[in-house]
Every structure is written in structure tokens, then in C-alpha cells.
């Protein structure tokens, strides 16, 4: 049976007090709506229909690369009205999941369970038991079966004591949506078209409404203001850290870790405090990440140790490598096994061979460095001429003295030595010594200028 996902994302988000549409507010490094779209794709939905309104152009531009049908809700007249807008493009057969752009963390497994129970009756929903149901629609049951959903403003005093609430997440056959949605009425306290009224229509048709509860309550929590956004962020990060610990990761403090993407981990990985992982990363066995590090789209092989406050973006790091503290690896950095990258060393678009070292205050950009070479403190590859980037090639077992400038394009042959303080503009032959510096001048008995006493 084909699955359509309908995402309601037209709200203004006034309480956010932001020029950014609410569904574009970031959570764990991804827009709220992006989380919902990701889940829809995990479900292999044939159709994803997103209803937009406030800031629609911005929203559509943000997700321009996604295969989405966009439907405008020019006037926000309720959730039922929003779903009515999809009828011209909604398939006649199959089922639809109705989700929300500001309820970002409902999980694939939960929705798969909802689909399964809904297939038996043609309609199902997610409900939740809460201690304080104020403001939420109540689930009214008779003999255990759902009879209606009553919005808080329309509820009687007795109904307001009910602690089972409507999350707004439904799975409904498309045939029934085409039948029920045109019948919705706005004769209620809010003057809106409630999607919840389809429950009463299902009961009137003699259908039993299936329901499930989420394993984790935060899955169905919505975001209306920045306080709720921050609270949901922390709940989500707590859950992600828990799942990583179950996979064998040791955290110095799981409350001080942020995962803003995905990470694959080996055995016995250790992560210190205030580490941020973004994009898609992979950490091998026995990898250690020091305090305050940021990793983005990076792979680090087994046994590597990263010291504090190092930043990685698009890097590939080999086994048993030592990095940091305060190192920066930029896109295209590829380090072989047993490499040493020390404090205040920046590596960009550079391959570094087995066992090579750059331990202090160095910039290596657009370079290829062989095995067992040593790059002295203060060395830079001068790769940019103001218009184009040029390559520096350094062979195996090369020794580059401190404070050297290698002006690309230039090649340093295997076994060569470059004297400290040199500006190398020509190729250096294998097993040779090259140095370039002005003659030292010394003046005896030199008197420095003195400040005049006031």
C-alpha cells in the first residue's frame, strides 16, 4: 500500500519572535521541518506533501533539493482546513500520515507501528497520557474505544479531567480523507476547521479508531517558543548520548555533548566534555576526543587521540594518529597512520603520509607530504598567488626547518633538508640541503633607544 506523508508547516510561529519561519528554526543542527522530511524519507513514502504559509518562499528555497509537493494555505483556518488544501493532489488510494513541521522528533519506528495498527481499521492516531493536559485536545473513550476528540476550549469540566491527549498525528486511508475532509465545519469556539472532527466521522461510520502511545514522550512534543525549543534540544541530546553509551561510548559527562548529525562508533570510544559532532562522522575503536572539539563530516580511524579544542571539517584521519590541542583540519585533509599534528597547526586539502609530523604553528594547504617527514614550527605552504591555488609536494623523510616558507608550486625531494628561516621558491633535489636567508649582521656595543624620563 502506497504511503503519503502530509506535513503541516504553515504556522506563523509568533511566539518565537523571529524573522525566520518557525519550521526553519534549528534543532540538533537541522531545521525542524528537516527532521520531519528525513523521517518521511526513511519511511519510503511515495509522496511528501508539505503545506506552507508564513515565510513560504524561504521554506521552499531551503528544501529546494527535496522531492516535495508544495501546497499553500494562504489563510490559517485550522488543521482541518490545512489538510483540505491537499485534496487536489492527494492520491485516491493508499494511506496518509499527517505530521507537523514543528513536531520534529517522532521516530520512524513509532510511525511504522502506527501504520501497522491503522491498516486494520483505516484510521489510527498517536495519543499520550500527561500529568497536565491543559490546552490539549482530550481523548474521549467509551468502553475503551475512542469516541471523539474534544478541544480544551470546547471541553466540559468533566472532559478536562481526562489526561489522555491528542498529539495530532494520524494515519488515515486516502479514500476516507477524500470523503471526510469536505464535510468539516467551523462551528466551534475558535471558528476553525478541526482535523480532529474526522474522528467523530469515523465513529459515525462504525469504524474503530486504532491508537498507540510513543515510547518516548518527547517524540510528540511540539515547539512554539524558544523555551520549548531549548527543552526539546536537551531531551533529544540526552537520548542520543544514551544510545551512544549503549553502543559502548564513554562520556566524561553525557549532558555536555551535542550530536548534530550522525556518528558511527567503534568499541571503547571516549568523548570528553563539550564535544560537538556535526554532519556524518565515524570514530573507530579506541578513539579519544578531547574537551571542546568540533567534528564535522570526519572519519577518524582506530587508536587516534584528539586533544582539546581541535576542529575538524571534512577530514579523514588514519590509525594511531596524534592531533592537537588547538589543531584545525579543513576539507580535504587526509592523514595516514601515526601522523602527528600539533598545536595551532592548520591542514587544508593536504595528504600527509605515514608517520609524518607537523607539531607546532604550521599551515599546510594544497600539499602532498610523504612518509616520515618533519615539518618544523612556523612553516607555511604559500599556496595562493592572489588568483590561483598552487600545490606543494614534499617527499619522504624530508626535514623542513622552522619558520620556512614554501612558495608553491614547488617540490621538495625525498630525504631533502630545508634550513630554518628559508624562503623556498625553487624545487629542492633529493638528499640535498637548501637554505635561503640574508646574511646575519651583528653590531657590538649597540645601545637601544631609551625613553626620556618625565
Curated annotation (Swiss-Prot):
Residues 1-226 are annotated as: Pyrophosphorylase. GO terms for biological process: cell morphogenesis; cell wall organization; lipid A biosynthetic process; peptidoglycan biosynthetic process; regulation of cell shape; UDP-N-acetylglucosamine biosynthetic process. Its cofactor is Mg(2+). One of its GO terms (cellular component) is membrane. In the N-terminal section; belongs to the N-acetylglucosamine-1-phosphate uridyltransferase family. In the C-terminal section; belongs to the transferase hexapeptide repeat family. Homotrimer. This is Bifunctional protein GlmU. It comes from Acinetobacter baumannii (strain ACICU).
